[in-house]
Amino acid sequence: MRKWILTWILPSLLHRSCFHIICLVGTLSLDCNDMTPEQMATNVNCSSPERHTRSYDYMEGGDIRVRRLFCRTQWYPRIGKRGKVKGTQEMKNNYNIMEIRTVAVGIVAIKGVVSEYYLAMNKEGKLYAKKEYNEDCNFKELILENHYNTYASAKWTHSGGEMFVALNQKGVPVRGKKTKKEQKTAHFLPMAIT
């Protein structure tokens, strides 16, 4: 008789405990919905203004990141005070600090913070700097599997292929016509300013 009572009571006990767990989880989710985004960000251990650099959220538009772009060829692109684009190996050079502003999904504009010139590419694939923003300043940002980023002109192509921002082993900008996504000259790591 005891065996029959246990098999009869056990399912009802399980259903009650499941019901209590569901009620508890529902209460917790309702509590989270009452939080502001800043409170939720605090609870998940990240701050609202600072997003993870490998997150794709910034590609949705309007986000501004201040970074140094480090090329796999060991150079940082810099935009000088007169607008000359070249590479430098000095990490603490203020002319290599870039403002990367999202202008559309996957499209960014790169601006030298100190020089206030935008990085641009013309139809021949030459990198240059421009004081006023225009379509030449738009680049498609792509995060590769090796954790580096590439920046291809959003406006110009060469024979149907993309033209990338690239620095050779001497820090000289490579013409976009001679670049490919796979080349390490076109791979950049956005580094936070410390």
From Swiss-Prot:
InterPro entries: Fibroblast_GF_fam, IL1/FGF
Protein name: Fibroblast growth factor 7
Positions annotated as glycosylated: N45
Disulfide pattern: none
Gene (name only): FGF7
Places the protein is found: Secreted
Secretion signal, residue range per the UniProt entry: 1-31
Annotated PROSITE patterns: HBGF_FGF
One term of GO molecular function: type 2 fibroblast growth factor receptor binding
GO-annotated biological processes: fibroblast growth factor receptor signaling pathway; lung development; neurogenesis; positive regulation of cell division; positive regulation of epithelial cell proliferation; positive regulation of MAPK cascade; regulation of cell migration
GO cellular component, one term: cytoplasm
General function of this protein: Plays an important role in the regulation of embryonic development, cell proliferation and cell differentiation. Required for normal branching morphogenesis. Growth factor active on keratinocytes. Possible major paracrine effector of normal epithelial cell proliferation.
Entry keyword set: Glycoprotein, Growth factor, Heparin-binding, Mitogen, Secreted, Signal
Protein family per UniProt: Belongs to the heparin-binding growth factors family.
Gene3D superfamilies assigned to the protein according to its UniProt record, in alphabetical order: 2.80.10.50
Subunit field text: Interacts with FGFBP1. Interacts with FGFR2. Affinity between fibroblast growth factors (FGFs) and their receptors is increased by heparan sulfate glycosaminoglycans that function as coreceptors.
CDD domains for this protein: beta-trefoil_FGF7 (cd23319)
